[in-house]
Amino acid sequence: MQFTDFGKLDLDRLPSPCFVVDEIAVQRNLEILNHVATASGARVLAALKAFSMWRLAPLISRYLNGSCASGLHEARLGREYYGGEVHVFSAAYSQAALEEILPLADHAEPAVVQDGDLDRDAFNCSGDQFL
């Protein structure tokens, strides 16, 4: 398995703080995930809560089917940078948050609406898919 040799990295030339990512290792992992998706028929999504390094979005979007988000800003990041499907879920959304997040979503898991009743008709995702 190939990895970048970080022993040759000149740490004095890096800004501080910064993130240093082994893009070769990320791509290798994406290739594995893509193989799993192809072999199983599953759709694999990037969990933006866990890894939302948007500069790698073009690479990630070549291998995965989309992203999953738990809030408005993650959903916007998924829609604008990652492409593909955008799935959203949270245990609770305010009515105002729902109105902003649903136009960005291809799939939304029904959740409790704070400060109001859940209106299933309010779910107007571009994919119109609900569990």
Could you say what each language-model-derived stretch is?
Residues 2-6, 27-52:
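N-terminal glycine-rich anion-binding loops that anchor highly charged ligand groups
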Residues 2-21:
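Generic N-terminal amphipathic, Lys/Arg-enriched alpha-helix
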Residues 9-10, 36, 59:
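Short hydrophobic/aromatic segments of transmembrane alpha-helices and their interfaces
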Residues 42-131:
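Active-site-proximal beta-alpha core segment in soluble small-molecule metabolic enzymes
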